[in-house]
Structures are given as structure tokens and as C-alpha cells.
Amino acid sequence: MTPSSRLTTRRASRNFRRMLLLILGSVSVVAIIVHAEKISYLIRPLWDTPPAPFEHYLPHYYAENVSINNLCSLHGWSLRSEPRRVFDAIIFSNELDLLEIRWKELYPYVTKFVILEANTTFTGIPKPLFFAENRNRFTFAEGKIAHGVFPGRLATHGSHEPFKVEAEQRRAMNHLLRLAGIAVGDLLIVGDTDEIPTPHTVKLLQWCDGIPPVLHLEMKNYLYSFEFQDDYTNWHPTAHVFNQWTQYRHSRQTDVLLADSGWHCSFCFRYISEFVFKMQAYSHAERVRRKDFLEHSRIQRIICNGDDLFDMLPEEYTFKDLFKRLGSLPRSASAVHVPAYVIQNADKFRFLLPGGCARSPG
């Protein structure tokens, strides 16, 4: 090989390496952009810290046929001469089945079911007033219902701020609660429709004196149905002994947490169309990164596998916890300790029970 040909070969080799590096760099940049959120979750233990643990994690005592007097005493509280009035307040979207289960479970203990809905989603998409249009389904609770409508705002040019709209609706709920007649000393339950307190928890807080003025209610987390239970628990719902400063909020408000107080059944819908609606409607709708995320066949497969609808990694703060929760949720064959109304109407709510993962399109 002549010197000139060797020089040409070296130049070609350098050019090839440069081109290869350029291609690899471009692919890497595209991959980072496409998977930025997933990468962020993967390295969360490096840049984020977990919220402070609750300082007061209250044991929760309950068994059938134990008197409320004994239960109050076990918690260090005393029995009231009469129960508190209870106001159950939710901002409603489209979870009609879970609303029915919630109200049937809590009906004996609740004075007023306070429900606020809007004609747009948090993301500014027009939506029906699902509760108003299906109110005849809830005639069993008609005398206890206080219903309000929030005039939503349509999104324009992608500038909508879903968390700001959500905060506005929570402020509107404060006004609706006062219209519903809530008074100082009443018990206020704050939570989303799918965060359902157990009836005995509400009864306990209704009948006992000495309870904390504000406490969070720990709830077991379920995904798609009661067949898939997640390891971690939900602490967002709260119970308040109402006073003039009480605000309807879904954020952390106290360091007191009552153990094992209910069920959080996330994306527990009957129809695939309801999954599609919520994926586009709720505050984290930016997680729908591709159109194929909304394909019915994909959603159905994910429901039956116990996978994540948004192809997200778990939100964890240590690599140990992150790797522990990778993969599909384990399937459970147990339908013990689920809402009684679901078991009493098992044919109607088969989709929430083990073996019922198949959904209709809707």
C-alpha cells in the first residue's frame, strides 16, 4: 500500500469514527428527550429526598362485635354522648362505580355527601357533568346530597395549568361546604372519589372524643381492581374536626397518620373508554407521551398484567426500593377485606374482583 493510499485510509477511518460518534450522540440526545421522565425517575435517589415520615403513626384497632366504647378506649379516646355530624366532600370527575361504592359504604354514618364537579377537566378539556347526568343512580342518597357545579375553563394554546385549576376547585369546595351547612365540631372527610374510608373508621372518628383535630387516613393502594395491591400506602385523605380555619386541601397537613383506614383504588374503571378519558383528563396528563398509549388493546393488556399505563418507573427515593418495585404488580386471589358493597353485588362489580380484568370498550 502506497503512503498516499494509507493516508487516505486513515482519513476515511477518522471520518467514519466521527460520523459514528455523531450518530451515537444524536441517538443519545433523542433517547434522553424521549425518555427524559423515565430517566429522571431512574436517578431520583440521586437528586431527591423522601418526605419526612409521620411523627405520630397511630395504631388502628378494630374487630367485628367489639363495642364502639371499647374501640374508643383502645385508641386512648372516650365515647361521646352523641355522634358528630359527618360531611364527606369530593371533587368528582367520572368515577361513577366508585362513587356508588363509596356512598353505599358510608351512607349510615354520613350527614351530607358534598360533591363538586366541573364541565371541563383539570387539563381544560370539555366534559359532561357525569354526576348530574346520572343522578338517578344515586336516589338512595338523595336527601343527603349537596351538589355544586364549577364553571371550568377551556385550555388555549397549551397554556393550561391543571394544578392551578385543581386548586381553584378545592377553594370552590370550601364555599360549597358552607352552603351545605357544615359547622364547627362536625367531622369533615377530605379525599378523592377513589380514596374510600372504611365505614368503621368513620364511625370511630364520629363517636370518639379526644381525636386529633386533623389526621391523615392511611389507605391500601390498589391498581385497576382489588386484584392488584401495591406495596406502598396512600396518606393523602384527611379527617378534620371542622373549625373556621379548616380548608379543603389534598396536601400534607399534619404529622398524624391513622393506620389502615381505607382503600385507594386507582384507575378502577369498568370500561376502557373511562381509562382513556382519565389518562387525558387528570393533572398528570403529560404522561401520555404517545398516541398509542391510548389504544384499547394496549390498555387491556396492561390492566390484566398489572403494569403501568404510562410506562413509568416507580417514584422511589432509594435504589433498593426502586428495584424492589420494578415490574408488574403481583396478582392476588383474595377478595377479603374489600368493601362489603362490592361483595354483596359481586356480579355487578366483577371487574373489581380477582379474575375480572377483562374490560368492555364502553
Predicted feature residues:
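Juxtamembrane luminal stem/stalk of type II transmembrane Golgi/ER carbohydrate-processing enzymes
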Residues: 1-89, 94-95, 311, 315-362
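Short, conserved loop/helix-junction motifs that constitute active-site signature segments
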Residues: 106-109, 208-210
